[in-house]
UniProtKB/Swiss-Prot annotation:
This is GTPase Obg. Residues 160-341 form the OBG-type G domain. Residues 364-444 form the OCT domain. Belongs to the TRAFAC class OBG-HflX-like GTPase superfamily. OBG GTPase family. An essential GTPase which binds GTP, GDP and possibly (p)ppGpp with moderate affinity, with high nucleotide exchange rates and a fairly low GTP hydrolysis rate. Plays a role in control of the cell cycle, stress response, ribosome biogenesis and in those bacteria that undergo differentiation, in morphogenesis control. Its cofactor is Mg(2+). PANTHER family: DEVELOPMENTALLY REGULATED GTP-BINDING PROTEIN-RELATED (PTHR11702), MITOCHONDRIAL RIBOSOME-ASSOCIATED GTPASE 2 (PTHR11702:SF31). Coiled coil: none annotated. The lineage of its organism: Bacteria, Bacillati, Actinomycetota, Actinomycetes, Mycobacteriales. One of its GO terms (molecular function) is GTPase activity. It comes from the Bacteria. HAMAP family: GTPase_Obg. One of its GO terms (cellular component) is cytoplasm. Keywords: Cytoplasm, GTP-binding, Hydrolase, Magnesium, Metal-binding, Nucleotide-binding.
């Protein structure tokens, strides 16, 4: 029998984004081809999807370290890098995704549901995408961003309509084996069942699912026995069925005391639950009592004697059956189906979320420094920390071995208002400023309060106005040298004489 795993810890690492490419178009007779570096591809995501073929988390248990594919780097000729392939993990219905701190991130309850557990990094821009009127031929590109890296906890909670609860060896596995096609392990010793078993009870025009939860003992809600690991499998059940051993011979135990002990554990477990399953409080869900093993001598007499007392004390329907002899099963099945149908009618329908409409709003220039925050560095004297999503992303994207890329970063930070904010905080030239994982000595490029001007880094002078001497101008200069004319006006108040023509003879 395959091992049942209902809790795993995954170490996820999404794909990194590919780096952008810095290249210039090279073609015969096209000296001014311009930048043509492509963008890097985005990194692959790690996606969890609910599959009806998955019934356990066993596959993920043996490979907890998962990494998605990296995005390809950009290339010349405007070729963008390929996107990294997503890593899709199939999980069974009822899987809950939690963070390391225990916060619920997603509840995957139905086939087809997906959740992006780790987002891939964005690819870096190539120099073709960075070109502008002020920076016509950038000699740099942006690096790709790293993908998300974190741990998540997956817990599987059975999606059953009815949950069978009871003390060990009460006959729960025997009951589910005769009511459905499930084939659980059956034995005459406690804790034979070490994993939940699910079965489908076919009632002709309808059907319902039933779960066999391993035996509970007093103190299960505090972790005694196997209870704490398996109590979560009854959180989603609409009906709880107490399976009671009517033939128990243990001193101090009887069907009523067994039911009371189990109810105390369920109440204690409910107080620790903070999840809304849309099924209501665990203590208020429908219940039935099943007095099993009525085929054993004296057990049937005891069950009939206690039936009225149980109904009067708890107010729940009581059924006397024998799973081994297959007696009393039909009335029990129809009663279970009736309770399940009532529960389905009462269950609130999920509300359709309102469509989110994004409406652009004007940005107040006076609030341009709201994208970051300047803090004093507690570890460095006269040091400052620049905290914000955008500045930290820009630091990751920058190739610090390229002076032009560093200049581009300085322009971006200046336009955002970082330099002005540092000056107002008291920072002066030479102070240590840390952004992300990079620390540097701050040298302000603009005075505080002055409008930032584009520096024009990366401008290709060949793309400016052509100042080369034309053929006609060379011809006239030759005439000057031969004495045919005294001078020639080149324009822009420049005069060519015999001496200057000889000096610039080979110009152009």
């Amino acid at each position: 029998m395959a091992r049942f795993v209902d809790r795993v810890v995954l170490h996820l690492e999404a794909g990194d984004g590919g780096n952008g490419c810095a290249s210039v178009h090279r073609e015969k007779f096209k000296p001014l081809g311009g930048p043509d570096g492509g963008n890097g591809g985005h990194g692959g995501d790690i996606i969890l999807t609910v599959s009806p073929q998955a019934h356990t988390l066993l596959d993920l248990h043996y490979r907890p370290h998962l990494k998605a594919q990296r995005g390809a780097n950009g290339a010349g000729d405007h070729r963008n890098g390929a996107r990294g392939q997503d890593l899709v993990l199939e999980v069974p219905a009822g899987t809950v995704v939690m963070s390391e701190s225990g916060e619920t991130l997603a509840d995957l309850t139905s086939p087809g549901m997906t959740f992006i557990a780790a987002k891939g990094g964005f690819g870096g821009l190539g120099n073709a995408a960075l070109a502008s009127a002020a920076r016509k031929a950038p000699g740099f590109a942006l690096k790709g961003e790293p993908g998300e890296q974190h741990d998540v906890i997956l817990e599987l909670k059975s999606m059953a309509d009815i949950g069978l609860v009871g003390f060990p060896s009460a006959g729960k596995s025997s009951l589910i084996s005769v009511m459905s096609a499930a084939k659980p392990k059956i034995g005459d010793y406690p804790f034979t069942t070490l994993q939940p078993n699910l079965g489908v009870v076919d009632m002709g025009n309808d059907a319902f699912t039933i779960a066999d939860v391993p035996g509970l003992i007093p103190g299960a809600s505090q972790g005694k026995g196997l209870g704490l690991d398996f109590l979560r499998h009854i959180e989603r059940t609409a009906v709880l069925a107490h399976v009671v051993d009517a033939a128990t011979l243990e001193p101090g135990r009887d069907p009523i005391s067994d039911i009371e002990a189990l109810e105390e554990e369920l109440a204690a477990y409910q107080s620790a639950l903070d999840e809304d399953t849309s099924l209501g409080d665990l203590r208020e869900r429908a219940r039935i009592v099943i007095l099993n093993k009525a085929d054993i001598p004296d057990a049937l007499e005891l069950a009939e004697f206690l039936k009225e007392d149980i109904e009067e004390k708890f107010g729940w329907p009581v059924f006397i059956i024998s799973a081994v002899a297959r007696k009393g099963l039909d009335p029990l099945k129809y009663a279970m189906l009736d309770l399940v149908q009532q529960s389905r009618k009462k269950r609130p329908k999920q509300k359709v979320e309102e469509r989110i409409v994004v409406r652009p709003q004007a940005v107040d220039a006076r609030k341009k420094n709201k994208d970051f925050e300047i803090l004093a560095d507690p570890q460095v004297e006269n040091g400052y920390l620049v905290v914000g999503e955008k500045p930290e992303r820009w630091i990751i994207q920058t190739d610090f071995e390229n002076d032009e890329a560093v200049g581009y970063l300085a322009d971006r930070l200046a336009r955002m208002g970082v330099e002005d904010a540092l000056w107002k905080k008291g920072a002066r030239a030479g102070c240590t400023v840390t952004i992300g994982e990079v620390s540097f000595e701050w040298e302000p490029t603009t005075a505080a309060g002055v409008e930032v001007q584009m520096s024009g880094r990366g401008t290709d002078m060949r793309l400016e106005r052509n100042t080369r001497v034309s053929a006609q101008e060379r011809k006239r200069a030759s005439q000057v040298r031969r004495g045919l004319i005294d001078e020639y006006d080149f324009g822009d108040d420049q005069k060519v004489t015999r001496e200057s023509a000889n000096r610039d003879r080979w110009q152009g």
